[in-house]
Amino acid sequence: MEKQGCEIEALDIDYNIFVRKINVNPFGIFRRKPRPEADQPVKTEEESLKLEDETGNKVKHVLKGVTCRAKPWEILAIVGPSGAGKSSLLEILAARLIPQTGSVYVNKRPVDRANFKKISGYVTQKDTLFPLLTVEETLLFSAKLRLKLPADELRSRVKSLVHELGLEAVATARVGDDSVRGISGGERRRVSIGVEVIHDPKVLILDEPTSGLDSTSALLIIDMLKHMAETRGRTIILTIHQPGFRIVKQFNSVLLLANGSTLKQGSVDQLGVYLRSNGLHPPLHENIVEFAIESIESITKQQRLQESRRAAHVLTPQTTLQEKRSEDSQGESKSGKFTLQQLFQQTRVADVGTMNIATEFTRDFANSRLEETMILTHRFSKNIFRTKELFACRTVQMLGSGIVLGLIFHNLKDDLKGARERVGLFAFILTFLLTSTIEALPIFLQEREILMKETSSGSYRVSSYAVANGLVYLPFLLILAILFSTPVYWLVGLNPSFMAFLHFSLLIWLILYTANSVVVCFSALVPNFIVGNSVISGVMGSFFLFSGYFISNHEIPGYWIFMHYISLFKYPFEGFLINEFSKSNKCLEYGFGKCLVTEEDLLKEERYGEESRWRNVVIMLCFVLLYRFISYVILRCRCSQRSFKTTLA
């Protein structure tokens, strides 16, 4: 018998969200207003109004006492109109959200959220994938991160999954997205499903898997899910908005939601019986699920009428008996066909004999931190070298700008005017290099979405991502530093010492790495590219203002002096000056037959000395580590707060 899934049961689920009427600071991810804990639910309207007075927020009841059950070998479809609470219920079943009241059980035991993420797959409505990786590479990297298997077995599993997903024809094609040409939308959705089933989960949960697809592609997706349920015994739960007639036939069970409440769960035929019991008669060849969704208003009115009659004791004993018989008849058809189907499903479950056995899976990650870092570094490197806008354009930009600057400042004279021009050159180089990496911000924002999705599934640690992200750019930035330093240094005629050239190249490398770290830090913080671009530009401008180039640090007001010491421009700027003018007896200005100003005098005037050469390098490295650490902390906060949902009005 094939591997079996798990029985998922939700009992009396209540879930509330807060609607804020005020503008929310997009950077306030560390500050959250008080919210009710799981053991302190908001149960009544009176309590809701009280909570609104205390916090300034309104409480919206998304789910109200929802109960449902999903079984192995079956597909449970959660249907209902927009705003019915389908996605919220799905995230609760996927252990991504915590309800205020109610419980979720896995194989009749309370769900262990950390463990459940290891044995389940959750496919979001949006395809969050790297567009420049091929289909096979995407699945292979996912397998490496989630499975501890030899390389041959990993490749064999990926090939088998590609065949199961029907993606052999596009296995070597790039995934693509809105801006990168790649595979079709239906194929991309199948890749998203493949990423979540590569570790062979017992439960597969999908949010609107047919959204945005044509009818043929949507049917292919559902047929594939049906095949997974019937051949591998998986428990499959999905939400769907407007299922077609052929799609509905594939569902074993349908959960009808309306206004956050359960109207009915059962087979499609049981749903038809339920509709008729409420006075609705769907046409013979009508799509029953669509008819039920369209008739929700009539159903709720009928239910409210029945509840009011019960409350007023209007029902006669005969009517009560008839309603009870009608409810009992929903569990079976007139011919007994569905009872036989249920017995057949129960027999298959009993054959496996694991329904009442606790699911035991390790909480640990599949790989060590070192292995995760190596895998992620490999994946990052593929993306960098395939991103022409980042790799080729940056390469041409750095080499071209180095040559142009070298020609503009060609062979500067060794006099006071030449010294001033050198200082201006260093200031421009700093401004250019520290502000030219903002174009990488969209790439980091895309990576952040993928990081949050993958870490929420337990694929790897956030710390491994932070280390890999820091390592992968080192060789790339070193190449850029050499391409820029070589022409500008020798064409301008800076310090002819080869060691001075190496130190200059080191400073350029650290400047590029510092700028990269700043962009990484703010990409973890800001909500989008527009805000990120504005914030980074403002921060860099402020740092340049207090660098010491426009105004000496001795003349900066005391209440602003802290900006001078945290400026990213200060230490490399000092490093350039020390590297160029230190240990040099060149005379810059003569008067009355003797030297009036030497290069050493310029350094003494600004109180720069040779002892600061390596101190500045160390401080620049500390800035790199600081911004990388801040980005790691922010990402950890984002990933840990992913389980909470707040609606902004």
Swiss-Prot record:
Residues 42-284 form the ABC transporter domain. It is a multi-pass membrane protein. The chain crosses the membrane at residues 390-410, 425-445, 474-494, 506-526, 529-549, 617-637. Belongs to the ABC transporter superfamily. ABCG family. Eye pigment precursor importer (TC 3.A.1.204) subfamily. Its main location: membrane. The gene is ABCG5. ATP binds at G80, P81, S82, G83, A84, G85, K86, S87. It comes from Arabidopsis thaliana. PANTHER family: ABC TRANSPORTER G FAMILY MEMBER 28, ABC TRANSPORTER G FAMILY MEMBER 5. Pfam families: ABC2_membrane (PF01061), ABC_tran (PF00005). PROSITE patterns: ABC_TRANSPORTER_1, ABC_TRANSPORTER_2. GO terms for cellular component: membrane. This is ABC transporter G family member 5. GO terms for molecular function: ABC-type transporter activity; ATP binding; ATP hydrolysis activity. It comes from the Eukaryota. Residues 308-336 are annotated as: Disordered. It is found in: Membrane. Residues 371-581 form the ABC transmembrane type-2 domain. SMART domains: AAA. Keywords: ATP-binding, Membrane, Nucleotide-binding, Transmembrane, Transmembrane helix, Transport.
